[in-house]
């Protein structure tokens, strides 16, 4: 969903607020306690969404980040790349998917993944904790990656690293990833010595490993997902742990996100 909504009670003054991730800015913090604050800090659709949030969100004690899904009354929503289809129409005024909590409003605020909030008469909170992983046997995959790493050349050149990322993203936009040899062969001459074919082989192996993990995830909820009318799975998953890790189906969703026109 989008945009990201941050809301809750600021422990510094005990006041309820709403905002986007700009509440965590180092400079020009945009935190909204009133409708006047929203008018001063935001404009357009984001301002309209924040006004609805200020009116209808419950005044919780903590601080939560959620994805905006939409205004109630329907059963199909497309806040961003994905289109969500609910089994029955949503009766509440607004719909959000909470996923992260904080203890303070600060640029250094520590994020804790995993939030469940009870829906109210005015706000429907989507359960983002309704997935589990059926642990696959990945020992062979890990062993193959470990065997390649000693022969993998990693560049200290930040420009070379950035260039390689851009190259990978270029192919993801196209929805196709060529083999490691091809990717190394098309590098600009000045970067070819910064990495080797094994570098891309390791990337390929890690990509395949993440895909296997994604295939092992089971979603228990009944929300259906679509991209351009075609059924698809959820965009990504984050492990609930002290060291959270995000898994995203890059070929499907990163490609769609790269080519997305925001509708908010």
Where are these regions (language model features)?
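Core nucleotide-handling region used for phosphoryl-transfer chemistry
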Residues: 3, 8-264
């Amino acid at each position: 969903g989008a945009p990201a909504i941050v809301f809750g009670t600021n422990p510094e003054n005990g006041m309820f607020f709403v905002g986007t991730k700009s509440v965590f800015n180092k400079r020009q913090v945009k935190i909204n306690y009133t409708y006047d604050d929203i008018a001063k800090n935001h404009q357009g659709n984001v301002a309209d969404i924040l006004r609805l949030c200020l009116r209808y969100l419950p005044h919780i004690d903590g601080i939560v980040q959620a994805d905006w899904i939409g205004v109630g009354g329907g059963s199909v929503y497309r806040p961003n790349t994905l289109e969500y289809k609910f089994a029955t129409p949503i009766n509440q005024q607004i719909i959000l998917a909470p996923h992260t909590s904080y203890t303070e409003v600060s640029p250094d605020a520590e994020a804790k993944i995993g939030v469940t909030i009870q829906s109210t008469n005015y706000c429907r909170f989507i359960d983002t904790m309704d997935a589990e992983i059926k642990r696959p046997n990945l020992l062979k995959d890990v062993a193959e990656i470990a065997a390649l790493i000693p022969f993998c050349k990693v560049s200290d050149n930040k420009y070379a690293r950035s260039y390689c990322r851009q190259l990978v993203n270029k192919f993801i936009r196209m929805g196709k990833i060529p083999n490691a040899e091809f990717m190394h062969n098309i590098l600009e001459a000045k970067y070819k010595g910064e990495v080797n074919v094994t570098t891309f082989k390791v990337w390929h192996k890690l990509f395949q490993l993440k895909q296997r993990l994604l295939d092992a995830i089971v979603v228990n909820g009944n929300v259906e997902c679509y991209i351009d009318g075609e059924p698809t799975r959820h965009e990504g998953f984050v492990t609930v742990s002290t060291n959270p890790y995000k898994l995203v189906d890059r070929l499907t969703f990163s490609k769609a996100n790269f080519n997305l026109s925001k509708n908010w």
